Every structure is written in structure tokens, then in C-alpha cells.
UniProtKB/Swiss-Prot annotation:
Enzyme active site: S25 (schiff-base intermediate with substrate), Y58 (proton donor)
Organism: Bacteroides thetaiotaomicron (strain ATCC 29148 / DSM 2079 / JCM 5827 / CCUG 10774 / NCTC 10582 / VPI-5482 / E50)
Necessary cofactors: pyruvate
Catalyzed reaction equations: L-aspartate + H(+) = beta-alanine + CO2
Protein's name according to its UniProt entry: Aspartate 1-decarboxylase
Length: 117
């Protein structure tokens, strides 16, 4: 049996931009993607801590070291710059494998979105 489990999470990142005029997606600093074990094109689930919105989109790679977290297109209507969001991705895996699987969870610096080591 296959089940869907949390694979990666960027916990409490700060939204830096909301760009309504770009077609869909979330742009994420490449440093955060690497640290969280996420890739461009990957489906992600976003939870906005400020307003309770929850939605899905896909990742676009942002400039490394920029701290960029930008919601694009229709998703830009669901957030405001400076909102705090949780970005999660999931993976399908065998039930037995899932029992011992440990997701990658990162906690970016709240002011800069830089990776905290």
C-alpha cells in the first residue's frame, strides 16, 4: 500500500512579493530549495499563518541568496508581502518505508529568509 507523507517543509518563511501578473506558481530562493530538498516544478501546499489561506501551486527557482518568496498569478491574491507561510511538499511511498521516513524541515531566518544552519 502506498501512502502520501510529508517530504519537505519550509516552516515560517516570510513572503517578499506577490506578483499577480505572472502566470502561476511560487518563486523560492534556490538556497531554500536545496536546504529543503525541493526542486523546480514540484507541487507544493502553502499555508498562510496570517490569514489562514491554504492552496497548492508549483515551484519556480528563485535567485540564490535572494531570500525571495514570491507568490505569482492567482495565488498572489491569497497572500500579502510580509505574511508568514509554511511551504510543504509530499511524497508517495510504501507504508513500511513511510514508518521510518524523516522529512526535511527547515526554519529560515524570519527577517531575511536565509537558511539557518
Amino acid at each position: 500500500m502506498m501512502i502520501e507523507v510529508l517530504k519537505s517543509k519550509i516552516h515560517c518563511a516570510r513572503v517578499t512579493e506577490a506578483n499577480l501578473n505572472y502566470m502561476g506558481s511560487i518563486t523560492i530562493d534556490e538556497d531554500l530549495l536545496d536546504a529543503a530538498n525541493m526542486i523546480p516544478g514540484e507541487k507544493v501546499y502553502i499555508a498562510d499563518n496570517n490569514n489562514g489561506e491554504r492552496f497548492e501551486t508549483y515551484i519556480i527557482k528563485g535567485e540564490r541568496g535572494s531570500g525571495k518568496i514570491c507568490l505569482n498569478g492567482a495565488a498572489a491574491r491569497k497572500v500579502q508581502p510580509d505574511d508568514i507561510v509554511i511551504i510543504m511538499s509530499y511524497a508517495l511511498m510504501d507504508f513500511e518505508e513511510a514508518k521510518s521516513f524523516k522529512p526535511t524541515v527547515i526554519f529560515p531566518d524570519p527577517a531575511t529568509n536565509s537558511v539557518v544552519k
